[in-house]
Regions:
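Acetyl-CoA-dependent GNAT
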Residues: 7-78, 83, 96-97, 102, ...
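Short hydrophobic/aromatic beta-strand or adjacent loop that forms the aromatic wall/cage
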Residues: 49, 151-155
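A short, internal acetyl-CoA/4′-phosphopantetheine-binding micro-motif in the GNAT/acyltransferase core
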Residues: 80-88, 116-119
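Residues forming the Rossmann-fold NAD(P)(H) cofactor-binding site
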Residues: 93
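Short glycine/proline-centered loop/turn elements that form peptide/ligand docking sites
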Residues: 125-128, 142-152
Length: 162
């Protein structure tokens, strides 16, 4: 375990463990993942995707990132989350750093993420957008037709240095 932080970032290859960690974290974030149908879709979706978890000394999951790659050159943050009590402690940045290293190893030129647009005026997602800005993402476009008009989808992108 890193002596500076109280957790390790581990790649999880066990497809039975990925949904356990994902459910545990996503259920701790009802302001972001309150829609049960979407939550279930994410929990099932992580099984076959690259997945990293932040585990503390007792092997408790503090957060996770699951990603996919489109067209061989665009890394996509499929779903991620960090326990509320661990927000602003570097867990998300450490997890994102691992995901970005993976994207670079796979030859990706860009990273992208879909999140709720500021046009929805929903405070929890303001924190989400600030997080993505802090790791180098920029807004690209808001699509009201992607999810629905009440939940406009903001696509954020980050060019990756190869």
């Amino acid at each position: 375990m890193d002596t500076q932080r109280k957790y390790d970032i581990l790649e999880i290859r066990d497809n039975a463990l990925k949904p356990v960690y994902a459910r545990e974290i996503l259920e701790s974030l009802p302001d972001w993942f309150g829609n049960k149908e979407s939550l279930e879709e994410y929990v099932k979706g992580v099984c076959d995707l690259p997945f990293w978890a932040a585990l503390d000394g007792e092997k408790k999951c503090l957060g996770f990132f699951s990603v996919r790659i489109h067209y061989g050159h665009t890394g996509d943050i499929y779903v991620c989350g960090v326990r509320p009590e661990c927000h602003r402690m570097g867990v998300g940045k450490a997890l994102y750093g691992q995901a970005e290293r993976f994207f670079l190893e796979k030859g990706c030129k860009y990273a992208m993420v879909e999140t709720l647009s500021e046009k929805a005026d929903y405070a929890p997602y303001e924190k989400t957008r600030l997080f993505y800005n802090s790791v180098g993402f920029e807004p690209l476009i808001t699509l009201t037709e992607m999810w629905d008009e009440n939940n406009p989808c903001l696509i954020m992108v980050k060019p990756l240095a190869l």
